[in-house]
UniProtKB/Swiss-Prot annotation:
Paired cysteines (S-S): none
Claim: Ribosomal protein is one of the keywords in the record: no
Biological process, per Gene Ontology: tail-anchored membrane protein insertion into ER membrane; vesicle-mediated transport
Keywords recorded for this protein, A-Z: Coiled coil, Endoplasmic reticulum, ER-Golgi transport, Golgi apparatus, Membrane, Transmembrane, Transmembrane helix, Transport
Function: Required for the post-translational delivery of tail-anchored (TA) proteins to the endoplasmic reticulum. Together with GET2, acts as a membrane receptor for soluble GET3, which recognizes and selectively binds the transmembrane domain of TA proteins in the cytosol. The GET complex cooperates with the HDEL receptor ERD2 to mediate the ATP-dependent retrieval of resident ER proteins that contain a C-terminal H-D-E-L retention signal from the Golgi to the ER.
Entry membrane topology: Multi-pass membrane protein
Membrane topology, Cytoplasmic segments: 32-116, 179-204
InterPro entries reported in the protein's UniProt record: Get1 (IPR028945), Get1_fungi (IPR027538), Helix_hairpin_bin_sf (IPR029012)
One GO cellular component term: GET complex
Coiled coil: 78-113
Transmembrane segments: 12-31, 117-137, 162-178
Name of the protein this chain belongs to: Golgi to ER traffic protein 1
Lumenal topological domain: 1-11, 138-161
Length: 204
């Protein structure tokens, strides 16, 4: 099969960056990324009138809500009620517009999901197919046990050589452990389970 003669340093850096981005996407979550892309699309890129109206009405709701919080319902009841009715009307209109643009959101979400998959998987498969026989690193003979040198060289190289398969395995392991160490202090503490007390048997 065809292989490409690419500089090993380029392969090392490229594969590391792609795997790092994969881990970052996993940490953030595809759904959050889709939400961010949708927000950018609706705010800056879309030419849909429904989306423009949706954004305007959302802004109106935000402004009216601020006004309502500054008014006392007891002291200025009429004004407060008027704003409240306007808010109810706007929320109903926003709900209707949201149903209208739901199809477009589904389309953008699908495109975003496909783009993420292609960006993160195609380069890796390209490297695996066309650079699989490129030696990336060399280990001085005898520095490791012979069986370990042989294992690290799998599946295409002689002992003492590190290829893409081994490099990607190591990078994935290091990144996973690094993410765990960074995120562990911020994880929610699990309460220690309380052992139930055995009910004392009452003498009959």
């Amino acid at each position: 099969m065809l292989t490409l003669d690419i500089d090993p340093y380029t392969i090392l850096v490229t594969s590391f960056l792609i795997l790092a981005i994969q881990k970052l996407v996993t940490v953030i979550g595809k759904q959050k990324i889709q939400l961010y892309i949708w927000q950018i699309y609706t705010k800056y890129l879309s030419h849909s009138q429904s989306i423009k109206q949706f954004n305007l009405k959302q802004k109106e709701i935000k402004d009216l809500t601020k006004q309502q919080k500054l008014i006392s319902a007891q002291d200025e009841y009429a004004k407060w009620t008027k704003i409240n009715r306007a808010l109810d009307k706007l929320k109903l209109e926003v709900q209707e517009l949201n149903e209208t643009i739901a199809g477009e959101k589904t389309r953008i979400d699908s495109i975003t999901k496909l783009a993420i998959t292609l960006i993160l998987t195609l380069p890796i498969w390209f490297l695996r197919i066309f650079c699989r026989k490129t030696a990336l690193l060399y280990i001085r003979k005898g520095i490791l046990p012979a069986y370990l040198e042989w294992w690290l060289a799998l599946p295409f190289f002689k002992s003492g050589t590190i290829g893409l398969t081994c490099w990607m395995f190591v990078v994935n392991s290091v990144l996973s452990n690094l993410i765990f160490l960074i995120s562990f202090p911020f994880t929610q503490k699990v309460e220690r389970p309380i052992k139930p007390k055995n009910e004392q048997k009452t003498e009959s």
